[in-house]
Each structure stands twice: as C-alpha cells, then as structure tokens.
Swiss-Prot record:
One GO term (biological process): translation
Entry protein name: Large ribosomal subunit protein bL9
UniProt-recorded Gene Ontology molecular function terms: rRNA binding; structural constituent of ribosome
Role summary: Binds to the 23S rRNA.
Organism of origin: Wolbachia sp. subsp. Brugia malayi (strain TRS)
HAMAP family assigned to the protein according to its UniProt record, in alphabetical order: Ribosomal_bL9
Pfam families the UniProt entry points to: Ribosomal_L9_C, Ribosomal_L9_N
rRNA-binding among keywords: yes
SUPFAM superfamilies xrefs: L9 N-domain-like, Ribosomal protein L9 C-domain
Residue spans of biased composition, Low complexity class: 157-169
Domain of life: Bacteria
Length: 186
C-alpha cells in the first residue's frame, strides 16, 4: 500500500514522501496516529497545497524537541527494586517506571522511551533512549539499586560530579576569555 507521510518517521522516510508499507501497518499504526494518508491523486494534490504549512509545523516541533532535549543533559533515573543476593531483580524495569520517575520534572510519554533492546532484570546502570522527535533522541542513565540508602548515596555522588563538571566548564570559559584577551592585546 502506498502512503504519504505527514511527518518524519525514522524507519520510513521524511515528511511528504510517498512510501510503500504493509496494509496492516498503515491501517493499525500510521492512519490512526495521523502519521500518514493513503496515496491517491486527491491526497497528493492536497499535500502539495499544505506542504509549506506541514514543513513549518515540523520545524516548530523540532525546535521544541531540541529545547526539551537540551534540558535533559546529564539527567539520570534511580529506581529502587527488590533483588536477590546475586543482583537479579524480581520482575523487570519497564518504560512506564522510567516515565513515572521522570514525571516529577517532565512529562514524558512511556511509548517514547526504549531500552535499545535490553531487558533490565539486574541491578546496575543502563541506558534508556527518549525520542522527542524523529530526529532527536536523548540518552538517559537508568540506575537500578536495591535500597533507598543506595539511591540516596548515588544521588549525592551524581550531584557532586555534576557540580565539579560545572566548575570545570566555568574555569574553561574563564581560561578561553583570558586567552582571547591576550590575543587581542598582541
């Protein structure tokens, strides 16, 4: 089945492209979420009329997503789970749990989060991908710990490391400013 994409979809193509997909994928996913329309002469003509509006809308969404992604720099999630002595947790970590943990500061749809094919069933540190836009994906560290005390200690370590990184960045900015001042004087 030929469809016209109404937005960029990483696995299919860009806005306005005509692509061939399986009928079930179109009926069950693309059409209900208004990501595509069936390619007919009428829909192609209508798309040409709306192309500039759709492109502007896509740029607006991209800008919003990039601002949101920038605010996620250095973010991490700590989840407390019951685990056996060898570190295996009872059950597994889900995207809903990560979204719930992030919801204290941000509103993130759990369907936009993935663990890159990894099942989180042990204690430790993992990476989760959050897709804000088809072109913008942010990595967030997910720490799975056994107790609240472990979580508290990890938060302290992370906050100290972030403070030291911020101080280093400020020192680098000051160093660059003095280097440029010296270059201007010569």
């Amino acid at each position: 089945m030929l469809v016209i994409l109404k937005e960029n979809i990483r696995t299919l193509g860009k806005l306005g492209e005509i692509v061939k997909v399986k009928p079930g994928y179109a009926r069950n996913f693309l059409f209900p979420q208004r990501k595509a329309v069936k390619a007919t002469k009428e829909s192609i003509a209508k798309l040409e009329e709306q192309r500039s509006f759709l492109e502007e809308e896509n740029i607006r969404k991209l800008n919003l997503a990039s601002e949101l992604a920038a605010s996620f720099a250095g973010k991490f999630v700590i989840l407390v789970k019951q685990a056996s002595e060898d570190g295996k947790i009872f059950g597994s970590v889900t995207t809903r749990e990560v979204a719930r943990s992030l919801s204290q500061e941000y509103e993130v749809d759990h369907r936009k989060i993935s663990f890159n094919g990894v099942k989180i069933r042990n204690l430790g540190e993992y990476q989760a991908s959050i897709e804000f836009h088809s072109e913008i994906v942010v990595q967030v560290a997910v720490h799975v710990v056994r107790s609240e005390t472990d979580a508290h200690e990890l938060r302290q370590v992370k906050s100290q490391s972030q403070k030291s990184q911020q101080q280093e960045a400020k020192q680098n900015e000051v160093g660059e400013a003095t280097d440029s001042d010296k270059a201007d004087q010569k």
